[in-house]
Amino acid sequence: RTGDDGKVEEGTAPIPFREPFVYTTSIAKPGFVRLFAEVVGAGPNVKFDGGAGAAFDRIVQMHGEPDDFDAFWKRELDALAQVPFDPQLEEVASPRPEVKLSRFRLGCAKGKPSTGFISVPRAPGKYPVRLYFFGYNESWSPRATAFPTAQQAPTNEIVLRVNAHGLENGRDAAYYAAARKAAGSNGYGHGFDPAENAKPETCYYLGMILRDVRAAQWAKTLPEWDGRKMLVYGGSQGGAQSLWTMALEPAITDAEVFIPWMCDWRGKAFGGRSGTDWGSEYAPGLDYFDLVNFAKRIRPDAYVNIFHAGLGDYICPPAGVASLYHALRCPKRIRWVQNCEHSWSSPAKGKQETVFTSPH
């Protein structure tokens, strides 16, 4: 047993065969308790990894944002606005004849273009736009970079599959392996170097966010866009990209995200919460990328659906995700799943789920 109160309990106990195993604990402050249990000798996936929260409505960001948060992002967006789109489109073979598929490349700040695939229905008409973003490791994998399937190029919406790193999509594995190595710093993976993260100007995520925003800005200029609905979609790092972009581009109306990453970095560093057990250690520059700070700035008439949050996910810890949810000032929904880690969920049927919604 661990938790946002810093308490740790461990031990072994016999398993009753005719009734549930019951473990009783408590927490004296708003936050979550995590319970990890496994059946001795039964294999790695015969386990429980989940938890419970107390005073859910009072689980909020523990420390304030930088005083110059808005000034910093205004400065960066103003610099981005000085760079022309200069869109370069290369039509490629489409997985379905009813859809036109192209690689896109857009002018952007911070030395790298905004890139990805765009699929547009060929039938005359106006369509909503969907921007897809991908997880940390996933963003280097074929799931993010390979040519879309027919299912990923629908006939009822415009889809941009945005490359997180400003790379050309549809290349071979060696290309991405070399690019991933180059994106690292001081032996850390992209975005993990504490020296880079000491200042927001040198954080890897700054360029990533500007590339994402640039893709959304360009999408607004497409003659096929219906001018009404623009949706962002992604999980983990892709969930962060979705909400970063939504906060900085007010044309975005909807978000569908799961296990969103980068929430309430200071909660672990200064508040004693159970923080992420993977990736970046806290550094001051990360305050400018904390997703809770962006959530406050999403337009109040938008809609955010966090359709999956794991109660055993301590890459994206529940207290941080709850803080994100409570910072949103728009209609919202969150679905908590019991016995669910970041990339593993119990195969058992009938897992406990808890859903919260709010009209504002």
Regions found by a protein language model. Give the residues of each.
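Cap/lid segment of the alpha/beta-hydrolase catalytic domain
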Residues: N137-L210, D264-T276
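N-terminal cap/lid segment of alpha/beta-hydrolase-fold proteins
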Residues: V8-P14, D67-D70, D78-G125
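Hydrolase active-site cap/lid region
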Residues: R171, G235, G239-P284, W336, ...
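Short, aromatic- and glycine-rich surface loops/edge beta-strands on solvent-exposed regions
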Residues: P30-A42
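Short beta-strand elements
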Residues: I15-R18, A42-D67
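C-terminal catalytic histidine-bearing segment of alpha/beta-hydrolase fold enzymes
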Residues: A322-H360
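Gly/Ser-rich "nucleophile elbow"/oxyanion-hole loop immediately N-terminal to the catalytic nucleophile
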Residues: H190-S236
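The feature captures the conserved acid-bearing segment of alpha/beta-hydrolase catalytic domains
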Residues: R266-R329, W336
